[in-house]
Amino acid sequence: MRPTGKLHLGNLHGALANWKRLQEQYECYFFVADWHALTSDYQDASHVQEYTWEMLIDWLSAGLDPEKATIFIQSKVPEHTELHLLFSMITPLPWLERNPTYKEQRKELIEKDLNTYGFLGYPVLQAADILIYKAHLVPVGVDQLPHIELTREIARRFNYLYKKEVFPLPEPLLAEVPKLLGIDGRKMSKSYHNAIYLSDSPEVIKEKVSQMFTDKSRLRKSDPGHPDICNVFSFHKIYTPAETVAQIEEDCKNAKIGCVECKKCLAENLIQGILPHQERRHYYETHAGELKEIVEFGIKKAQMVARASLEEAKAAVGI
């Protein structure tokens, strides 16, 4: 996960909820991808360190357990970059140029100069991030599938060129997660300025919820609503008690409750729902020494594995 901004509810109920489940079943490595943040934010990286520690606080507050998973910062394990260099020597340029994510982001992020090797080649760094721990499964969304396939191709090519099965071919691990849209109905994203952040105060949450888009076909309170297509209702299903959700659904369909009242109810439940997370955030914010120890422990664990993999790869190459 790249530290390019604060984490929001979409992150909490998407990647973090999934990672929390996975750490109970697998040996997991979770790292803050601060080098990857530089692919798009290289002109001003002053915020990367701040967001890195904010991200780690949110991860721990969301339930990632340093006793069950290895949690660390990418740039503190320099073996990633050395393996990336080895991979960059064998990766054909057309493999990178046909990457659909590369093409899409070039179109979307028009305000940034992305004509750099770092941006074109970041999937090679991703491959190093994955293969240096000899990962067999990688939790990803559908949009990341091309990157996993490229990682497999790089591993296959490396093994073929140096006639040794150094790296496994990882498989994607897809998971269904609740789709929480931003307050404007688009994908929740810091880039769209439509996110509800895990660090938002109750006052800010109330203000953002009051701005949320609702059922466009419901123009008046007396009009029957359609909860199944209302963004507010999708949040209710996560943060409001089930019996209340059922009542809201019925009242909305029968025009017994208006959108303003519905949003006020959601805001109160959402504030209470993320309160435990925010209390844990406050704990780590005020116990910086403990946070640092957790991360340093994860860095040492990761580096032991990464160093062994790198040495094996270098031996296969003959350097």
PLM features: residue spans?
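Short, flexible loop/turn elements at secondary-structure junctions
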Residues: M1-P3, S75, D184, D200
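Internal, conserved structured core segments that host functional sites
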Residues: P100-E104, L109-F158, L181
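N-terminal Rossmann-like or analogous alpha/beta NTP/dinucleotide-binding catalytic cores
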Residues: P3-A128, Q278, H282
